[in-house]
From Swiss-Prot:
Its main location: cytoplasm. ANK repeats lie at residues 51-80, 85-114. The modification Phosphoserine is found at residues 991, 1005, 1031, 1034, 1040, 1046, 1055, 1084, 1111, 1113, 1116. Residues 993-1002, 1084-1094 have a biased composition (Polar residues). The gene is Ibtk. It comes from the Eukaryota. PANTHER family: BTK-BINDING PROTEIN-RELATED, INHIBITOR OF BRUTON TYROSINE KINASE. This is Inhibitor of Bruton tyrosine kinase. It is a peripheral membrane protein. Interacts with the PH domain of BTK. It is found in: Cytoplasm; Membrane. Keywords: ANK repeat, Cytoplasm, Membrane, Phosphoprotein, Repeat.
Length: 1352
């Protein structure tokens, strides 16, 4: 375990190694497993245990896809089988339900058809694991799959291309047509739907398609002549078609060359369906039809009728008069017996087979009726092929000794198949030469082979083993194929055997088959498979509508000062702001009112007065109580009101005499509220309650008579509201109030009536349009603001007063296509999405769902989920699952997961899961294991013995480090794009005191190679880490990323991270007090929360001091007077031309100095270069300082010292430093305006007490506002330059030279890409007003390059 290399060779076959490897695979994590395998055994990928299992078998069984992929890269043999059951890794991953591992194996070429010792392939295991409720029946909705050579367009795919495996006939699936029977012929095909409709395609010569013409149809087309009949069975041959309806009528069409249509007089052809006259059937009901090339067969329970060319297959003798054809249906006399009841009939070109209910099988051929077998009870299907006809009957179409041998197949209810062949003349049971047992549910027969469908939905193709005596040369080929056959199948066929031996071959892409058919020649095939959604029960559900609740909320939240209402009603002393569109749609009265502006109405109780506080129309409504008008509005908005609610207790409204109505607007109405405390009553309600007491005493004298008479509704609020509803044209409300009574001061709904619900239309009331939506493609939609705001919070926020869209007169541009925007608006108005429900375009519905998800229209999103589930197919299931996972469509995702789980075999065989991401594949695996109940018991218990890997970490294996550093060539570019995208999603924000910075600050400041770094941090960031860092506070510069170091600003600002040491300053600035620094009884001078610092990967001193100072300062900079500003400007001009200090030296980009050095140099440069543009920083003095000192005072150069002095200086501490003081070394880099970057080496003392007492106020550097400036801080003492800093500088210059030589091409390309993006962003090309140049910053000093001579 601890050895660096394994103790074996590449040919290791150690059984102990194998056991240890398998033990670790079962109990370790993926990282531990890979680390162990890389160190433990050279042959860990292929070593096997005693059962033949390797690491790949166990990894796929445990679902550890990462280990499996790693083993595949190491060359593990994926096709190796274990010794116990012959399972491959694919068998095991399927058995344990790890679909992600299955897909990984399939991508590396593992076959799905490899069989184990029991003859089961991985597809068979999937079929065996199918849930028990999934059963395929012929009554299920079925889809048609066809394949073959397609010579005559008989497959219906719209082209003449051949199909090598079953393909869906999507015409029926798109139109929702389910087919229950398919008949394939040489020149055409007939399809019978479950609804009784007939479709045909192929060559139409002679009218065999029944469309009224002889045109060729490439795809199935409905036979219009039979659309009014419910057809139950179809039969067809080479030139004609026979159709049987539910009522026993028979229709035929096509060529009538042999009088097989049964039409009198016989035409040459018939291109539309025509009925066979019932008089020839003696009033009996036809229950079945069959057809051959030369004849047609009809049968009832009692008799069989044939017609057509009599070549011996009709069951009739030769006509003595020489008539070759039977024109009308004629009963077969040999089967005319009282004990014969016909159950099944089949026909071929030269033979007819009949089966009776007693189990007798009759063959009509050679002008005879032969009994082939007896007592074959419970037969479900019979088929016949071949046959020979008398060529003298029609020498033009028949040849002497023509035809094929007769073969008859019969299947009983138990799934047994019996075969009768003319070469053996005996009925034999078929036995299958297949490694496992199959149960047959349907059969089809052609001249060369048999097709089968099993009860499990599988499809097979079978062929007979040829006779040994005639095909002895093929014996060598036959014997290997029977090697894995069941024990009851002998390898050598014998004509005297009681079984007919059939060799089976599985059909691909047949997993839900219920029926199969073939043409007589065996060139084209069709198979009916159950609809893949048949067993799906996870169907999305649309939540209940909140349409009325949203409008009710709009009514409740509307006030006179909002920007949404456009009309106000004054009723009594109350004002009701409302929306014209809703009132106009609900009432013709209000529509006329708004059209006429209240000037030409006959009703004088409503008139326009003036404008309300928001400038909207104000209407006065008289002789209506405010409560009644409130109920009225409530009904118009929500389609209901309180007086329609059973059990509601309304307030009693009493009307006084008419002469009392001339006073105030409310003087004629009094209300008694017996259900509210006096403290909750308004003054008006108390007044009405006092007046009601007197009225109640007057009515005590005749309480009974008060309930009768003319004024019965005067004190009933229900009747009063009904009267008001009629007055305002709300007949719907009036009719619904008919079934409402007020009993015992409560509402009693006697008869609940439902009227026309609230229906809104975008096209109604066009004169009230107040907002216009404009789509991306330029189409405009006029809408009503109140509907948009009520239905969607997005529009409510957009159209509020605080946004420009609310006051803009221009159309609102929506980033949505017009088709999608129309669906959104229709939903907002009608609460329905008819277009979505009827749409077959999955992409369009997905686009609507995306927009609905963005706009948070949950119910429309659910409608889209339902529509997508209805259109779920095997082709789009994986795509929709990935789509649902991406847009958080939970119900759609669940439906897709179950759909894929139910059809896992078909989707894996079709390779349809390649669009799924790894996360979705993992979710699919989890769901699949939960869906199969047996998966709970299929768990591999981790092996207890074996090596202990509990202490093993990821770093233990060298292979991981190599994998991580070996990036793809385009990886850096990909990460740069991701970082750019993330930066767009997170825009920078800046406030006066947040300390942030804008994009212009980043672009104008020069890129720096050095980083502020704590003493603890020595890590180097890779290029992907730099490019994917947060966009706030960091950006990718142009220098090499190898010299970038991980920043850690928290070390200088959080005392809990640096224990026992004083906090290091950044740029000589004391850090702010954190919450731990402030005592509980002292009031902090800062705000409640300390500012958060933004980490940066590339910060120069000028820029960093600016934003760091801003981030540290919780208050705004002080405002100084004009004199101070003038003095400051004078000092700048005075010292601007001063010579630079001797300490100024050029420093290269990328030099790595310690944090102390950088701080020290930066502070010194502030003092020396104050007149230049390289640094202008003003520090506020501590509160204890009596007056500010001049920060621009000239700095005295340090005295010259010897080498010994430098050594002694480093050994002894600097005088004047306390125990908590530190020497700060700062590396400063100038701005882009300076021609060269300076280096200053100095040592500074921190000011004692600054950190513990208060937080200094730091202004933003180089503020454009001259009125905002800060006081000047005193300059700290200068520290001597150490020898170590000189050595460090030389080392960094050498490192800079190496970096410049080894700069990777990928980084250079990133820089060039960034330069081009900046040029485009600042519109540098063709700009006559500005000259914009973007170039790399100078690298700075490098070490002198040395070229060594080699080979001397």
């Amino acid at each position: 375990m601890d050895a660096a290399t394994p103790d074996c060779t590449s040919k290791c076959r150690s059984l102990k190694h194998a056991l240890d490897v398998l033990s670790v695979v079962t109990k370790g994590s993926e990282s531990q497993i890979k680390s162990f395998l890389a160190r433990y055994c050279y042959n860990a990928a292929t070593v096997k245990d005693a059962f033949g299992r390797n690491a790949g078998h166990l990894a796929s069984s445990c679902g550890k896809k990462g280990v499996l992929d790693w083993l595949i890269e190491k060359g593990v043999d994926l096709l190796v089988k274990d010794k116990e059951s012959g399972w491959t890794a694919l068998h095991r991953s399927v058995f344990y339900g790890h679909i992600d591992c299955v897909w990984s194996l399939l991508k590396h070429g593992v076959s799905l058809y490899m069989q184990d010792k029991e003859g089961l392939s991985p597809l068979d295991l999937l079929m065996k694991d199918r849930p028990t409720h999934v059963v395929f029946k012929d009554t299920d909705p079925t889809e048609v799959y066809t394949w073959g050579d397609n010579t005559n367009f008989t497959l219906g795919h719209g082209s003449q291309n051949s199909k090598h495996h079953p393909e869906l006939l999507d015409l029926f699936s798109r139109s929702g047509v389910y087919v229950k029977q398919v008949v394939l012929c040489k020149f055409h095909s007939v399809f019978l739907s479950q609804k009784g409709q007939v479709y045909t395609c192929g060559h139409g010569r002679g009218g065999r398609l029944g469309h009224g013409d002889e045109q060729t149809c490439l795809v199935p087309r409905l036979v219009e002549g039979l659309s009014g009949h419910n057809c139950s069975q179809v039969a067809a041959a080479k030139d004609h078609t026979v159709v049987l309806t539910d009522d026993g009528c028979v229709y035929t069409f096509g060529l009538n060359m042999f009088h097989q249509l049964g039409i009198i007089p016989p035409p040459a052809s018939c291109n539309v369906p025509r009925q066979i006259q019932a008089k020839y059937l003696k009033g009996r009901t036809i229950i079945g039809v069959a057809a051959g090339r030369f004849h047609t067969v009809l049968w009832t329970r009692e008799a069989v009728y044939t017609l057509g060319l009599n070549g011996g297959q009709l069951g009739h003798l030769l006509d003595p008069n020489g008539e070759k054809c039977v024109t009308t249906p004629r009963q077969v006399s040999a089967l005319h017996h009282k004990d014969i009841a016909v159950s099944l009939v089949a026909a071929s070109d030269g033979a007819t087979v009949c089966v009776t209910t007693r189990g007798d099988i009759y063959l009509l051929a050679d002008y005879q009726c032969k009994k082939m077998a007896t007592k074959q009870l419970n037969l479900k299907k019979v088929l016949v092929s071949g046959g020979c006809m008398e060529y003298k009957v029609d020498p033009e179409h028949l040849t002497e000794n023509g035809g094929q041998k007769i073969c008859v197949l019969a299947m009983d209810g138990a799934g047994r198949v019996f075969c009768w062949r003319s070469i053996s003349s005996s009925l034999k049971q078929c036995r299958w030469a297949y490694p496992r047992q199959v149960s047959i549910s349907d059969i089809a027969l052609n001249r060369n082979e048999i097709l089968f469908v099993t009860q499990d939905g599988e499809g097979f193709k079978g062929k007979w083993f040829e006779d040994k005596r005639k095909n002895s040369e093929k014996k060598a080929d036959i014997l290997p194929n029977l090697h894995h056959s069941s024990s009851d199948v002998s390898c050598v066929p014998d004509t005297n055997s009681v079984y007919e031996r059939i060799r089976l071959e599985k059909l691909p892409f047949a997993h839900r088959a219920v029926s199969v058919s073939t043409d007589p020649s065996g060139c084209n095939f069709a198979i009916l498979q159950s609809d893949p959604k048949t067993s799906l029960y996870e169907i999305p559900v649309v939540s209940s509508s909140s349409f009325f609740e949203e409008f009710g909320k709009l009514l409740r939240e509307t006030d006179e000062m909002d920007s949404f209402h456009d009309v106000t009603f004054q009723v009594g002393n109350r004002h009701f702001p409302a929306h014209k569109y809703i009132l106009a749609v609900r009432s013709d009265f209000f529509q006329k009112l708004f059209l006429s502006d209240g000037s030409s109405l006959e009703l004088t109780d409503v008139y326009q007065k003036d404008e309300d506080a928001a400038g909207c129309h104000l209407f006065v409504v008289e002789k209506v109580h405010p409560d009644l008008f409130e109920y009225l509005l409530q009904f118009m908005y929500t389609d209901t009101c309180d007086l329609l609610t059973h059990g509601f207790k309304p307030r009693m409204i009493v009307k006084r005499k008419a002469e009392d109505c001339e006073g105030s607007p409310d003087s004629h109405l009094h209300t008694v509220n017996c259900h509210v405390d006096d403290k909750q009553k308004s003054a008006f309600e108390v007044y009405r309650s006092n007046q009601a007491h007197t009225l109640s005493e007057r009515q005590k004298s005749k309480p009974k008579s008060s309930k009768k008479g003319k004024g019965v509704g005067d004190d009933d609020p229900v009747r009063m509201l009904q009267s008001v509803a009629k007055k305002f044209g709300l007949s719907n409300l009036s009719s619904r109030l008919e079934g409402v009574r007020l009993e015992n001061e409560k509402i009693n709904v006697i008869a609940k009536k439902t009227g026309n619900k609230l229906k809104l239309s975008q096209k109604k009331c066009s004169f009230l349009y107040d907002v216009t939506m404009k789509s991306v493609d330029g189409k405009e939609f006029s809408c009503h603001k109140c509907v948009l705001c009520a239905r969607l919070e997005y529009f409510h926020s957009m159209l509020s007063r605080s946004w420009i869209e609310a006051s803009s007169c221009a159309a609102l541009e929506m980033p949505i296509q017009s088709e999608i925007l129309k669906v959104i608006l229709d939903y907002l108005y009608t609460d329905e999405a008819v277009v979505i429900k009827e749409s077959q375009n999955v992409d369009f519905v997905c686009s609507v769902l995306v927009v609905a998800d963005q706009l948070l229209i949950t119910r429309l999103k659910e409608i889209c989920e339902v529509a997508l589930t209805e259109n779920l197919t095997l082709k789009n299931a994986a795509m929709l699952l990935e789509f649902a996972a991406l847009y958080n469509a939970g119900q759609l995702k669940l439906s897709c997961l179950q759909f894929i789980g139910l059809n896992m075999a078909a989707l894996l065989e079709a390779r349809s899961l390649d669009v799924l991401s790894e996360d979705v594949l993992k979710d699919l695996s989890i769901f699949y294991r939960k869906m199969i109940p047996a998966m709970e018991r299929r768990v591999i218990t981790p092996y207890q013995d074996g090596p202990d890997i509990s202490s093993m970490q990821v770093e233990d294996g060298e292979v991981f480090f190599k994998e991580e550093i070996n990036m793809e060539p385009n990886y850096s570019e990909t990460m740069f794009k991701k970082a750019k995208t993330r930066a767009k999603k997170k825009p920078r924000k800046r406030s006066d005191s947040s300390g942030g910075y804008t994009l212009s600050d980043v672009i104008q400041s020069p890129p720096s190679a050095g980083l502020l770094k704590s003493a603890k941090t020595n890590s180097v960031e890779s290029l992907p880490e730099l490019l994917t860092s947060d966009s706030e506070g960091s950006y990718a510069g142009v220098a090499s990323p190898r010299d970038l170091q991980s920043p850690d600003f928290t070390a200088g600002f959080h005392s809990d991270k640096v224990e026992g040491k004083a906090k290091p300053y950044v740029n000589g600035i004391p850090p702010p007090c954190t919450r731990e620094d402030v005592k509980p009884w002292e009031k902090s001078p800062t705000t409640k929360s300390a500012p958060q610092f933004i980490p940066s990967n590339r910060v120069d001193t000028a820029a960093s001091s600016s934003w760091l100072a801003g981030s540290c300062s919780p208050v705004s900079p002080p405002v100084v007077d004009l004199r101070t500003i003038m003095e400051t400007e004078e000092n700048r001009q005075k010292y601007g031309a001063a010579p630079k200090s001797n300490l100024g030296k050029i420093i290269s980009h990328g030099i790595k100095l310690s944090q102390k050095q950088r701080k020290m140099i930066a502070l010194t440069t502030k003092e020396n270069n104050s007149g230049t543009n390289s640094m202008e920083a003003i520090l506020t003095a501590p509160s204890k300082s009596p007056k500010p000192a001049n920060a621009w005072a000239p700095l005295h150069s340090p005295l010259s010292r010897s080498f010994r002095d430098f050594l002694l200086e480093e050994k002894k501490p600097v005088p004047g430093y306390g125990s908590g003081d530190h020497v700060k070394k700062v590396c400063f880099k100038g701005t882009e305006n300076s021609p060269a970057l300076n280096v200053a080496r100095c040592s500074t003392h921190g000011t004692p007490g600054l950190e513990s007492n208060h937080v200094s106020d730091f202004p933003l550097l180089d503020s454009p506002n001259p009125w905002q400036s800060s006081s000047l801080a005193a300059s700290p003492a200068v520290a001597p330059v150490t020898f170590a800093s000189i050595v460090e500088e030389e080392r960094q210059q050498e490192a800079a030279l190496i970096r410049s030589r080894e700069k990777p091409l990928a980084l250079i390309q990133v820089e060039e890409h960034a330069i081009q993006d900046l040029l485009v962003f600042y519109e540098a090309f063709g700009n006559p007003e500005e000259f914009v140049v973007v170039e790399r910053a100078p690298q700075g000093p490098l070490a002198v390059p040395m070229w060594n001579k080699h080979g001397c």
